[in-house]
From Swiss-Prot:
The gene is panB. One of its GO terms (cellular component) is cytoplasm. It is an enzyme of class 2 (transferase). Gene3D superfamilies: Phosphoenolpyruvate-binding domains (3.20.20.60). It is found in: Cytoplasm. This is 3-methyl-2-oxobutanoate hydroxymethyltransferase. It holds the Pfam family Pantoate_transf. The lineage of its organism: Bacteria, Pseudomonadati, Pseudomonadota, Gammaproteobacteria, Legionellales. It catalyses: 3-methyl-2-oxobutanoate + (6R)-5,10-methylene-5,6,7,8-tetrahydrofolate + H2O = 2-dehydropantoate + (6S)-5,6,7,8-tetrahydrofolate. Its cofactor is Mg(2+). Mg(2+) binds at residues 45, 84, 115.
Amino acid sequence: MIAMNTPDFQRMKKDNKKISMVTCYDYWSACIISQSNVDCILVGDSLAMVMYGHSTTLPATVEIMAQHIQAVSRGAPNKFIIGDMPFCSYRKDLTTSMNAVERLMQAGAQAIKLEGADAHNLKFIHHVVKSGIPVIGHLGLTPQSIYTLGGFKVQGKEPSAAKKLMADAKALAETGCFAVVLECVPSELAELITHSISIPTIGIGAGPATSGQVLVLQDLLGTNNQFQPKYLKKFLNGFELIKKALDDFDQEVKTSTYPHLETHCY
């Protein structure tokens, strides 16, 4: 049984209880998260970068997303799972876009997330919500628009940009989103948005005042020693710990210490 549902997001904001979200892509790590206190899981299109080594999220497809959602849902059947709508999957005709939503939901998602709040997106979100499917919005640094934004940069610094982000957040709430991700926006702006809309905000690089926080699992575990954006706290030195385990294995194999005849052999 899933421990969390969409009304819980609203309740937690009302009760001033922070929401924890982790981005996860595979079965084995989902199994670990399923035993943790983390509230919910995002299967993000960032898997194109983290799992496949691409430089952007754009190569993620609906089918790739569905496969990873299936794996995560099998590993963490007790967690609320959000599936990312990948690049351009919701910018096509309504039937094609809804087929993409259907694929992700049938793969095991309980909600979908999509980036931006232009007129096209708002109309589509309205249709999806009216179809009984929960939607999370995503504002600020929207990686699918990376070439338009000019890189991975903080958004909303200028007054006009901040005003637009506020208007977009209000529009997403009014259209029926049950939460919105705020990525790489000034903390004061994120706080103002959080207090100005009825739905929870989930921050990544958006300061402490948002309704919750999301980090990629591999990032918070510190598995990439080359990746250190300002917003990231590494809760584990995973790179060094994993490397040491591999080196210890290598040494024990080469010195015939492993496998031990009495302990590891049949």
